Amino acid sequence: MSEPTIEAPQPATTLPRMLIGELKVVGTLPEGPVLLCGNHVSYRDVFLFGKVRASARLLVHPLVFSFPFLKKFALRWGFVQVSIDDAVALLKQGQTVAICPTGLVEALGEAELPFKTGAVRIAQQAGVPMVPVYFHYGRYPGRWVTPFSITVQNIILFCLWPFYRQGVTIIVGAPMDPAGDVKERTKALKAAVDALKPEMRV
């Protein structure tokens, strides 16, 4: 493993409620190892996969582990560095792994960034289903942030988090078979995640 991991992740509880407010989960997961694949509309998303399954290990950017203080909490929360080999190994051990296929945060709260193929490749190599997850926040900024880069948008959101502390609904979709052409399955995964957006559901 790229970084040591603790046997049982301890998901953050107080911090998400402080940053987000009320949390609600809709849907259930199948038993056994799965790859959770979620949209990435806020830096706060990283705390939410543990609400879907407490033992889930989230793949995060290596930069997170470069800060000693942050690394301490990242390990406690079950975060691991992004690595296809490590993710596959964890899944084959029977653990649940989580990933945001866009990699970057979609600061507008809209599905505008493409999914990378890593999620499908991980699920295929591990032989586990992918489970689409959608994070729907109670309030999110409008198009007024579009003139700014995604980095600046996220700085704005970080500074204004009390204003956007309106709760979140975590919507869990049906498991997906990863078998098939990687690019096509990646498109299908993105469509499945996007379809969970409340406005699009029937």
Where are these regions (language model features)?
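Helix-to-loop junction immediately C-terminal to a conserved catalytic motif
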Residues: 6-40
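Residue-level preference for the first positions of well-ordered beta-strands
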Residues: 33-35, 96-100, 131
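Catalytic core of membrane glycerolipid acyltransferases/transacylases, capturing the structured
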Residues: 28-86, 109, 141-142
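Soluble, non-transmembrane catalytic domains of enzymes that act on hydrophobic metabolites at membranes
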Residues: 1, 108-117, 184-202
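Catalytic-site beta-strand/loop segments enriched in glycine and acidic/polar residues
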Residues: 90-120
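Short low-complexity, flexible loop/linker segments enriched in glycine and/or proline
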Residues: 73-75, 98, 145-149
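Short gly/ser/thr-rich secondary-structure transition/capping motifs
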Residues: 17-25, 78-82, 151-155
